[in-house]
Amino acid sequence: MSDRHEDGSGATAAQDTQDAHAAHDAQDAVEQAWHGVVATARRTAAEGLVVGTSGNVSARVGDLVLVTPSGVPYDRLGPGDTVAVDLEGRQVLGELTPTSELPLHLAVYRNSDAAAVVHTHAVHATAVSTLVPEVPLVHYAAAMLGGPVRTAAYARYGTQELADNMLGALRDRTGCLLRNHGTVTYGSTLDEAYDRTAQLEWMCRLWLTASSVPGHSPSLLTRAQLEEVQDALKGYGQPG
């Protein structure tokens, strides 16, 4: 009897240790993700993609979504300000109120394999959102976002209607414009999501610049040319 009891105690102790390690790893993952969210949000401000407390950034860790809070300057956020919700939007970490654009972020995570979302009010992209239903193919960088970038119909910020409009524009894409509002991009990492935002803003600036020359219209790529680039991009970057 004593041997069986000791064996059971040993198994229980081993399981407790394993659970403790798993909990520690999960906590580390959350802390690292929050650090990345804050760093990326600060980067959007530093590089002029947002003004003040506008825009928002999120990252997914398992069934948790870590997201910037509403109305708090990014340079004031620290390790103790973690804000996290579940995929239904219920807050599970932190005391600060999540961003008002939470429906937008959750819609992306529920309908894609995204691990990060970046939303900005980048000035050139927002300007283009007021002009066209789709960003003209002025550069092959559009391939990095899955194809010609669409403009989602306008709806008030923070609404499910806006989130639904965004999903339509994101079909087979990793980024879109929000009419009279800004940009949304997502990726498998925060760096990838941010890079797609930067590429989108740059393309919009390029098109506005080329379009402003009197008496000339920018030459545009064909869909076939863009598809050729998409094929070439499959081998882009470092292996592994």
Question: What is each residue range found by the language model?
Answer:
Residues 2-12, 16-240:
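Glycine-rich flexible loops
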